[in-house]
Amino acid sequence: MTNHFIGIGKYIPTEKISNLFFEEHQFFNEQGEILDQNNATISYKLKQITGIEERRYARKDQVTSDLGYMAAASAITNANIDAETIDYIIFAHNFGDVKHDTIQSDMVPSLAARVKNLLKIQNPYCVAYDVIFGCPGWVEGVIQANAFIKAGLAKRCLVIGAETLSRVVDEHDRDTMIYADGAGAAILEASTNNKGIQAHLSASYANEEKDYLFFGKSYNSEKCPNTKYIKMYGRKIYEFALSKVPLAMKKCVDDSSYNIDDISKIVIHQANEKMDEAIVKRFYSLYDQDVPKNIMPMNIHKLGNSSVATIPILLKMIMDNDLENHQINEGDVVLFASVGAGMNINTFIYQF
């Protein structure tokens, strides 16, 4: 038995934030020293490395669960189902609901419970819980939903990924420019024709890797040292991803009934354009092949990195034909992959 998506939804915030927005920021390095480059140069270099030209921020009156609800409602409409038939709501995020101009995470009750309430689902046996798994959280939620259905514990699962990273960034850290807000969701149920998830793999590396992404104080020493913001060691993450993710993708393919030539698209977490390109290039090199043309759709240029939300948003955009030169047709085999805080990696193969 395989399980497939019957509905996919997204919510992309309306507020566009271009790189020009950051030109008045004062950036510091890790030692608390003002960067000697002007902000125009910093923005240019960021675009060259990450590909990001602009990103989206949630409205001031919105929080993560609001974004997740919008994506969930979109997925339910797309699936044309009664929300009361959903057995599980799995909400992937990392920071909870964070109100505008605060940096306090609110995770109780769970964001999944909040979405269930907003959807007005009355069925008490619709179980709602959250997943905190770094950027791969939505993919891990899909893998968990797949397991529930295979085990006979559920027939239909809603998996949401949403984040408001703009609320947890240090405005004096240039990495702030990478992060964005957004939400995506999908509904999974058993397939009658063996379409859907064909194989999957997850891994966690929690030795020194666990500290590659963390909460730390502002680079501006005048800021309150007790207030923490999202921080990362970008070079270490890049090296980790390049060494581990291609191997995980290969193992997933090799453990399936497919081979490398069957893969028609790779839908990868939109973390960093150069890193994603390097991962895919190394993946194909493991098979002594060059990267096929138009194999990897990207939307990071206009939407930035919204963590758990990037993959479901990207998938919905492809399915809606919103990306030039990227379509998914019936029978296509797509490889999904993500990497993030933990450090966690996951991947799955899906036949449409």
Language-model region placement:
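Acidic, glycine-rich active-site loops and adjacent beta-strand->loop/helix elements
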Residues: A92-V98, I132-G137, G161-S166, A203-S204, ...
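Flexible, glycine-rich active-site loops centered on histidine and acidic residues
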Residues: K150-A183
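Conserved beta-ketoacyl condensing-enzyme motif
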Residues: F5, D61-I132, Y258-E277
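Condensing-enzyme catalytic core mediating Claisen C-C bond formation in acyl metabolism
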Residues: M1-D61, D173-S243, L247, V339, ...
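Conserved catalytic cysteine-centered active-site region
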Residues: N39-V63, V98-R156, R282-I313
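Catalytic phosphate/nucleotide-handling subdomain of diverse soluble enzymes
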Residues: K316-A337, M343-F352
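A contiguous, well-structured pocket-lining segment that forms one wall/lid of small-molecule binding clefts
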Residues: N226-I300
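Short, well-ordered amphipathic alpha-helical segments that serve as non-catalytic structural scaffolds
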Residues: T41-I42, S65-A79, L111-A112, F240-S256, ...
